[in-house]
A protein has these predicted regions:
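N-terminal accessory beta-strand-rich subdomains and adjacent acidic, glycine-rich linkers
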Residues: 20-198
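Sec-dependent N-terminal signal peptides
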Residues: 3-16
Length: 198
């Protein structure tokens, strides 16, 4: 009996260990874990050097704006446990109808993490796609009775950068997203934004 309990106790830390996925060329790595209180967290490295420090993930729902009756809880930021994770790869080449290149390669490794918020019964997936030149993530909501229709009030996705990196960004405006791509340091975006949209 003591041996069984000790073995079970040794396995417990493994269930909350970070899940990691790397780009096809291995240069970029993204790690996901649940921080204290079951808060989804990720970080990213490039060639072993930190680029994004541990950053939290989550959403806040608009109060009383969802069809799930009886649930006053609006936070999708903590209280999660990991129910499943899987890593997969994808590689395809496709031909755009219009553009500068004849073919585009869509090649990435993916980490899908399925989370369950125990006190609400809600489920949320976070999908990370890691390419040789960057990373993307998205929130997904499997069909479920405890979250049928909802409005996202706030997105709490953090990008805790490790330095004043070079960024390529699009200046968004209230009436158009069709602006030219800008290149600057992160610290220069706010000052350059007005000139970029005018």
């Amino acid at each position: 009996m003591k041996t069984t309990l000790l073995f079970s106790a040794l396995l417990l830390p493994l269930s909350v260990a970070a899940q990691t996925v790397s780009s096809p060329n291995g240069a970029i790595s993204v790690s996901f874990s649940l921080a204290d209180g079951g808060r989804p967290t990720y970080e990213m490295t490039y060639k072993g050097r930190p680029v994004v420090k541990p950053s939290h993930l989550g959403l806040e729902l608009a109060k009383d704006k969802h069809a799930t009756k009886g649930f006053a809880e609006t936070s999708l930021m903590d209280g999660f446990t990991e129910s499943h994770s899987e890593v997969s790869s994808f590689d395809e080449t496709w031909k755009p109808v219009w553009g500068e290149t004849a073919t585009i390669r869509n090649h990435y490794n993916e980490l899908l993490v399925s989370l369950s918020q125990d006190h609400t019964g809600r489920q949320m997936n976070i999908r990370f796609r890691v390419y040789d030149d960057g990373m993307g993530l998205r929130y997904e909501f499997p069909q479920q009775d405890s979250l049928v229709y909802f409005i996202v009030k706030e997105e709490h996705t953090q990008f805790a950068m490790t330095g004043d990196h070079t960024a390529w960004w699009l200046p968004g405006d209230y009436d158009t997203q069709e602006q030219e791509t800008q290149e600057s340091r992160l610290s220069e975006i706010r000052a350059r934004f007005h000139d970029a949209v005018n």
